[in-house]
């Protein structure tokens, strides 16, 4: 650390390199924060979490009880032990509450004045954060599994929606209607994700074992169908042009948008080149996944090397994205974890589980440990680097 600081001060190193190195060190030390609680509001499992990208202060959660909760993550009390309080919630008594399980919540990427939620009640709702009223409601014929707004788009306000049907629907927030439909999958759409690098590139994952990349401006179908065999002849004809050997229920782009991570019920996670569609063949080993619906996992941002956080039963597995090495298992929940979200400003992780709890995972604090001996002289508390090195031995000798 001192060498990084010295090199930055003298102009030999890019300041960003020091920041990335420190962020990496903090992520590798993530542990359950025993001094921070998240207020328990949900009466059943927590399915989805999202932290707004503007300040990184407010977090949304959606549960199997249909409730949506907004939390303030900032420690306003300045006390070592504190609870992240729920600012407000769309509870069971709210007139616009979802009737069934909420599967996805997401903040509007550009400010905190609006957020969205989708549910098994076949609706996507757009909320005014200030009034906590539904500003718009999109109704579908099928159960909604997933939705996503582009974090990078500046020329459109499209929300991609995956339902129990095989068609991906694009809803336009400006017009308040479904603008068009993407056809190509054969079964339900379990996960959708816009590229953080390109405005119009969308990835979709389905129970038909396929992952497709789309340019939504094109009318001629998808750009790519990801093939786990990279075009080589497979042993079974039915596995041709499939990303996994089971349902694909999780998608996540890396922060730079150059790669795409997918997870399937075949207990495998794969890393793809998002430009060419090639399987990079990184081996993550067995990644347990028994979820029958979408699984929300997260990728780090701002580190020297990227990390991915994947729900793994009642734990969260931490992998190095490009090497496949499993670095840690975060243990704290009592039941299966269904979602996690990364907070890049402070390198923190939040996870939601079927045990109804939301847990905070934070880097370790490196505060000095006080000396147990109260009678020890004050100079023993000094850092040796700052101690006086003068000695009278020369005069005595």
From Swiss-Prot:
The keyword Kinase does not apply. Part of the CSA complex (also named DCX(ERCC8) complex), a DCX E3 ubiquitin-protein ligase complex containing ERCC8, RBX1, DDB1 and CUL4A; the CSA complex interacts with RNA polymerase II; upon UV irradiation it interacts with the COP9 signalosome and preferentially with the hyperphosphorylated form of RNA polymerase II. Interacts with ERCC6/CSB (via CIM motif); promoting recruitment to lesion-stalled RNA polymerase II (Pol II). Interacts with KIAA1530/UVSSA. Interacts with a subunit of RNA polymerase II TFIIH. InterPro entries: G-protein_beta_WD-40_rep, Rad28/ERCC8/Ckn1/ATCSA-1, WD40/YVTN_repeat-like_dom_sf, WD40_repeat_CS, WD40_repeat_dom_sf, WD40_rpt. Pfam families: WD40. The gene is Ercc8. GO terms for biological process: double-strand break repair via classical nonhomologous end joining; proteasome-mediated ubiquitin-dependent protein catabolic process; protein autoubiquitination; protein polyubiquitination; regulation of transcription-coupled nucleotide-excision repair; response to auditory stimulus; response to oxidative stress; response to UV. The keyword Nucleus applies. This is DNA excision repair protein ERCC-8. It is found in: Nucleus; Chromosome; Nucleus matrix. Disruption phenotype: Ercc8 deficient mice develop normally, but show a loss of retinal photoreceptors after 4 months of age, and enhanced UV-sensitivity. PANTHER family: DNA EXCISION REPAIR PROTEIN ERCC-8. Keywords: Chromosome, DNA damage, DNA repair, Nucleus, Phosphoprotein, Repeat, Ubl conjugation pathway, WD repeat. Substrate-recognition component of the CSA complex, a DCX (DDB1-CUL4-X-box) E3 ubiquitin-protein ligase complex, involved in transcription-coupled nucleotide excision repair (TC-NER), a process during which RNA polymerase II-blocking lesions are rapidly removed from the transcribed strand of active genes. Following recruitment to lesion-stalled RNA polymerase II (Pol II), the CSA complex mediates ubiquitination of Pol II subunit POLR2A/RPB1 at 'Lys-1268', a critical TC-NER checkpoint, governing RNA Pol II stability and initiating DNA damage excision by TFIIH recruitment. It comes from Mus musculus (Mouse). GO terms for cellular component: Cul4-RING E3 ubiquitin ligase complex; Cul4A-RING E3 ubiquitin ligase complex; nuclear matrix; nucleotide-excision repair complex; nucleus; perikaryon; site of DNA damage. It comes from the Eukaryota. WD repeats lie at residues 41-81, 97-137, 184-224, 243-282, 332-371. Pathway: Protein modification; protein ubiquitination. The modification Phosphoserine is found at residues 391-393. GO terms for molecular function: ubiquitin-like ligase-substrate adaptor activity.
């Amino acid at each position: 650390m001192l060498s990084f600081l010295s090199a930055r001060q003298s102009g030999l190193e890019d300041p960003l390199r020091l920041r990335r190195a420190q962020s990496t060190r903090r992520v590798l030390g993530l542990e359950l924060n025993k001094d921070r609680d998240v207020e328990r509001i949900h009466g059943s499992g927590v399915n989805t979490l999202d932290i707004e990208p503007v300040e990184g202060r407010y977090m949304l959660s959606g549960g199997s009880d249909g409730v949506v909760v907004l939390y303030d993550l900032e420690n306003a009390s300045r006390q070592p032990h504190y609870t992240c309080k729920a600012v407000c919630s769309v509870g069971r008594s709210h007139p616009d509450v979802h009737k069934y399980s909420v599967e996805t919540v997401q903040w509007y990427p550009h400010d905190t004045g609006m957020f969205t939620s989708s549910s098994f009640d076949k609706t996507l709702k757009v909320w005014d954060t200030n009034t906590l009223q539904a500003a718009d409601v999109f109704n579908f014929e099928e159960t909604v599994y997933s939705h996503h707004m582009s974090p990078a788009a500046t020329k459109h306000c499209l929300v991609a929606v995956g339902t129990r049907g095989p068609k991906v629907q694009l809803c336009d927030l400006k017009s308040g209607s479904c603008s068009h439909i993407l056809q190509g999958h054969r079964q339900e759409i379990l996960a959708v994700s816009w590229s953080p690098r390109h405005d119009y590139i969308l990835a979709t994952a389905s129970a038909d074992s396929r992952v497709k990349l789309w340019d939504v401006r094109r009318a001629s179908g998808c750009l790519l169908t990801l093939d786990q065999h990279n075009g080589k002849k497979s042993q079974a004809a039915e596995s041709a042009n499939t990303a996994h050997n089971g349902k694909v229920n999780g998608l996540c782009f890396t922060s730079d948008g150059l790669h795409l991570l997918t997870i399937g019920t075949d207990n495998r996670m794969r890393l793809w080149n998002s430009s060419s569609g090639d399987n990079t063949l990184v081996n993550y080993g067995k990644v347990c996944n028994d979820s029958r619906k979408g699984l929300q996992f997260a990728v780090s941002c701002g580190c020297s090397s990227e990390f991915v956080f994947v729900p793994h039963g009642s734990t969260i597995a931490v992998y190095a994205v490009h090497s496949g090495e499993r670095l840690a298992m975060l243990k704290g929940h009592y039941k299966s974890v269904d979602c996690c979200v990364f907070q890049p400003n402070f390198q923190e992780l939040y996870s939601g589980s079927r045990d109804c709890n939301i847990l905070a995972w934070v880097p370790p604090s490196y505060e000095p440990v006080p000396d147990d001996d109260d009678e020890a002289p004050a100079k023993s508390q000094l850092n040796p680097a700052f101690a006086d090195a003068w000695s009278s031995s020369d005069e005595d000798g």
